[in-house]
């Protein structure tokens, strides 16, 4: 068996094609030539780890499955909240989660499941070895109840938008977001690689 491609990544995807052929022909490969290339540059999915926590082991296994099917992007939805209607119309009772460790905002990280910065860095590196680009998503200005539970001053008017919206007229919101994003994007060893 010979796999040829114009890039290293192309050779890797060729190994996925070979694995699929072996899976579909368990009694041996037929003699011949196969030509395979993606129709779309971006082939991915999004997983909501905010509303439903998934362990790092699960995410790593998921990356391997995506790689087998030659997907190349996985968006990780790191923060979100439930719907106030399901929590007695009380924003203070409404479930909210932020799944990534934060040193700059102690207490922001969800207690019912989260990832350390080092785990998330390692996960992105592992995914890259399988041809998957991890796209971390911090959802703002809506779906931000975890942030407004942490600091209620960040919330928009509850009547017009709901407490899960950040008030974009407040300087405190921009200070908070600048600090939060800087924690994950800056430095010699950023969390989002």
Which residues does each PLM region occupy?
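Feature activates predominantly on carbohydrate-active enzymes
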Residues: 2-193
């Amino acid at each position: 068996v010979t796999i040829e491609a114009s890039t290293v990544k192309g050779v890797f995807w060729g190994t996925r094609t070979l694995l699929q052929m072996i899976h579909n022909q368990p009694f041996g490969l037929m003699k011949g030539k196969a030509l395979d290339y993606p129709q779309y540059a971006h082939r991915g999915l999004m997983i909501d780890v905010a509303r439903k926590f998934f362990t790092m082991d699960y995410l790593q296994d998921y990356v391997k499955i995506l790689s087998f099917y030659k997907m190349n992007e996985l968006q990780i939805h790191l923060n979100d909240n439930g719907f106030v209607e399901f929590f007695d119309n009380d924003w203070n009772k409404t479930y909210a989660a932020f799944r990534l460790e934060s040193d700059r905002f102690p207490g922001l990280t969800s207690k019912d499941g989260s990832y350390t910065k080092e785990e998330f860095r390692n996960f992105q590196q592992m995914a890259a070895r399988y041809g998957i680009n991890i796209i971390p998503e911090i959802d703002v200005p809506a779906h931000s109840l975890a942030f407004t539970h942490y600091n209620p001053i960040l919330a928009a008017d509850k009547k017009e938008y709901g407490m899960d919206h950040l008030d974009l007229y407040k300087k405190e919101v921009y200070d908070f977001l600048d600090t939060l994003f800087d924690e994950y994007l800056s430095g010699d060893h950023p969390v989002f690689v």
